[in-house]
Every structure is written in C-alpha cells, then in structure tokens.
Amino acid sequence: MSPIALLSVSDKTGLIPLAKALVNDLGFKIISSGGTAKLIESENLPVTRVADYTGFPEILGGRVKTLNPKIHGGILARRDKQSHLDDLDKQNINPIDLVVVNLYPFVKTISKENVSWEEAIENIDIGGPTMIRAAAKNHQDVLVVTDPSQYSNLIDAYKSKKITTELRKKYSQQAFEHTATYDLTISNWIANQSSSKKVSWLQSLPLKQELRYGENPHQKASWYGEPEKGWSGANQLQGKELSTNNLLDLEAALSTLREFGYKNNISNPSYQKAAVVIKHTNPCGVAIGDSPSSALKRALDGDRVSAFGGIIAINCPVDEAAAKEIENIFIECVVAPYFDETAKEILSKKKNLRLLELKAESVQKADKNHIRSILGGLLIQDLDEPSIDQKKWKSVTELIPTDEEMNDLSFAWKIVKHIRSNAIAVASNQQSLGIGAGQMNRVGSAKLALEAAGTKSKGAVLASDGFFPFDDTVKMASDYGISSIIQPGGSIRDEDSIKACNELGIKMILTGKRHFLH
C-alpha cells in the first residue's frame, strides 16, 4: 500500500516541489483540500480531495473541511495496536503517514491597519491545529511538518531512509511549539481587544540566536525575538557576532535615541539629527546637530574617554562624513536606519566593527512592554515612552528660563530618563557635557556630572530624574555656574531647593513626572 500524505497549507511556499518529490520520487498518494489541492492539480499531479475521500462536503463556508473521523482516525491510529488497525478496516479508513500543515495567517491578518473583528476571527484556524496536534501526538507513526523551511530536510530524510525516532520527536516538538505560539497570539490579541485584564502573561518567542555567553564568559545566554520586530528585524552588515552586552547597550542606545525621533530618511529639514554614545547601558554622549556627522562629533565630544569601546546610535542615515568620525576610534557597534555605500566602504576597513541597519518599521512593530525577571517571576510594565508635555511643567523660581534655556532643559530631560538612577545630566546647546549615573545619593551623581562638565558647566542646565531631598545639589550646581535646573519635584523639602535657587540666581522647572531607571 502506498504511503499517504495529507497536505493543507496557507503558505504555499515550496508546495509544488514538495508534492512532486512525494509523488514522483517517494510514491506517496496525496490527500488535500481547498487552495492547496487546487494548486497541486494545476501541476497535473494526482491528488484526492478531502471531501471525496471522506464522502462529506466542506460546510459552513469552509469552516469544516478536515474535521472528520476518516482524517483524524487515519492520523491517530497506532500501527502497533491491532485494535486500532481493526477499527480502521471496519470504517474503511486509510492510515495517514505524513501531515504537512501550516495555519491561516492570523498574525498577518491582525497586522493590517483597521482589520475588523470578523476578518480576524475568520482567520483563526481550527482544522489545521487539530491535525497538527493529532500527528504530533502520534509521531511514532506519523511525521508532521509545519514550516516550508523543513521540506528539504524532510525529503532528504525520506530518500536516505533516515526517518529516525529522534527526527520524529524533533518534528513533534516543533509542531506543538507552532500551535502553542499560534494560540498565544490569538489569546493575546483578543485580550487586547477587550476591556478585561489578562490573568496570566503568555508569550512565545522563537530562538533568534545562541549567544557566545551572557554578561560574563561563565554565563550561558540565548536571544529570543519575534521576526522583523525590534532587534530581530535588524540587518547586521558586518563585524563580529553580537554579544549579550552588545544587545543590552544597543537597546539602551535606541531607547535614548527615540526621544529625538527615528526615521529611515531625513527629507524634512526640521528633523532633529541626533546621535547617542552608550557605555555599560548609560549614555556618555548625546547631541543634536545640523547633519549626522555634526551630531555624532558633538556626542563624542561630550566624553571621548568614556566613548572608547562604546556603542553609537544615529537616528538618520549615515553618510561619508559621519563614517569618517567613526573611522579612527574604537567602537563596538554602530546602529542607524541606513548606511550609504560610501559610509559602508569606509567602515568596512574596521573588520570587527558591528554595523546594524535597523529600519524604523522594525522599531515601530516592537512590543511596548518592558519585561524583567525576578526570582520565580516576571515584572512587566509599560515602556517609559518618549513624551514631553511642557504645559504641565511649572516654573517655580523668581527668574524664568529663557527660550534657549528651555530648549536645553527639554534636551537634558530627555537624556536623564535613560541614565541609571540616581541620575544627573548637564547639557548646553543641545549637547551633553556631563553624566552622573547610578550613585546611591543624588548629590554624588551631581558631583560626577558637574566634574565631568568642568568649566563648560557655566551657563549650562542640569536635569535630575528624581526630586531633590535637600538643597545640597542646588548649591553644588551654583558652584559650577549652572543657570537652570529641571527636576520632578515632590519632595517635602521642595521649598528649600526653590529658596536656594532664588538666593543663587538659578531658574528651576518642576515637571511633575519622575523617571527612575533601575
């Protein structure tokens, strides 16, 4: 008796070469339905339609096609159980040896703009997952394939007679993973369309890459991510394999950079061209410039010592001039929406430098949850998204910041939220001058930032991610010539800091919003 393959796929990639190999090279008979059967028939390949095999037509507009005992009995019957084989004989059911199924394109459907509830629901596959799960359960007798990328290996295994138990288990595991991911996607989408709160966190991400190691060589690490979303959508143009620390730094760089926009092109002359330099997930240089090269040079000038071995992110295409700024410094990675051919040629001389093109579309598609692990669980929060509402800011001192100072205060406020708390940023003329990060007291971070800025701090502005518990930071800022301060406010001693500002001739803005980063 010829082996039987059941083929029912939404993604028709590689279907015809597979069907030809099964029929012509391996002697399979094919059972199929709908568009899959129609495509196979168009190639003059023999195929039995499901409705003809079961004797039961498709009903409910195609909702019921393969949900039939002649299909599922053929898949689920164990060949080593005589009672199962007897049942097949009694019911005139043929055993099915291979199930090739992929599912209705639910993800593609819900990704469309303004997709209707009805259209999404109609793209929830029922028969497909049922066949996949049945075949995966009975993997000792039935091979199950769910992705076109598996077809070549499948045919090779048949031809070389290497259909091993291990291969069957591998395909079974991948099949259950496929249906689990599909169900999770549907569950999460329905939850997002309703007002009910999710009672459990469900997410399935495919393995993107096994990393060389974690933050340190003795730690194992893997990278999981949704295809085409966020960093999984980045195209590495050159350089060594990305490391765990590279990815953490790249994420910090992009988070900071998005405060200023992120676009594939800069046709709008008013678009802010920004560059960020990151070291150990903290910004050490941030600046806006008239061109990509100007922004990058100013960001590097913010702290060239710390920039050594860092990560660079630019929110617009990298051209020849920008590439030349990178050419003679040691940098681990550069990420931008685009690198022109001249820039790529210049930077190709730095063989170990990792260049990544990350399109704006991949950034926009990424999940807006911030997830961190704790012992035995996860903490999930909304991203601290780029947003500034100056209408809610309050000028609380006798002196009011000038327009130029307000621009710098806004710039510094965008930066400070991406510095590890306690965080202080000193800036002037849309350029960071000093960063104080991760100190256990706020005045300690202020000291680091002000000392880094040095004499450049005269007339500059200072931003703090949290309120001032005492007036000591104001007094230190005055010693360095700071003109204006921006901070959330909310301390029971706010008046002490405001009083100190008035006495020392410093302007102060309270935003009413805190930006801790742990």
UniProtKB/Swiss-Prot annotation:
Species this protein is from: Prochlorococcus marinus (strain NATL2A)
Keyword terms of this UniProt record: Hydrolase, Multifunctional enzyme, Purine biosynthesis, Transferase
GO CC annotation, single: cytosol
InterPro entries assigned: AICAR_Tfase_dup_dom_sf, Cytidine_deaminase-like, MGS-like_dom, MGS-like_dom_sf, PurH-like
Keyword field contains Nucleotide-binding: no
Pathway where it operates: Purine metabolism; IMP biosynthesis via de novo pathway; 5-formamido-1-(5-phospho-D-ribosyl)imidazole-4-carboxamide from 5-amino-1-(5-phospho-D-ribosyl)imidazole-4-carboxamide (10-formyl THF route): step 1/1; Purine metabolism; IMP biosynthesis via de novo pathway; IMP from 5-formamido-1-(5-phospho-D-ribosyl)imidazole-4-carboxamide: step 1/1
Documented EC number(s): 2.1.2.3, 3.5.4.10
CDD domains listed in its UniProt record: IMPCH
A single MF term (Gene Ontology): IMP cyclohydrolase activity
Top-level taxonomy: Bacteria, Bacillati, Cyanobacteriota, Cyanophyceae, Synechococcales
Domain of life of the source: Bacteria
Record-annotated MGS-like domain positions: 1-146
Entry's free-text remark on domains: The IMP cyclohydrolase activity resides in the N-terminal region.
Cross-referenced HAMAP family: PurH
Family: Belongs to the PurH family.
GO biological process terms held by the UniProt record: 'de novo' IMP biosynthetic process
Gene: purH
Transmembrane domains' residue ranges: none
Catalytic activity: (6R)-10-formyltetrahydrofolate + 5-amino-1-(5-phospho-beta-D-ribosyl)imidazole-4-carboxamide = 5-formamido-1-(5-phospho-D-ribosyl)imidazole-4-carboxamide + (6S)-5,6,7,8-tetrahydrofolate; IMP + H2O = 5-formamido-1-(5-phospho-D-ribosyl)imidazole-4-carboxamide
Protein name: Bifunctional purine biosynthesis protein PurH
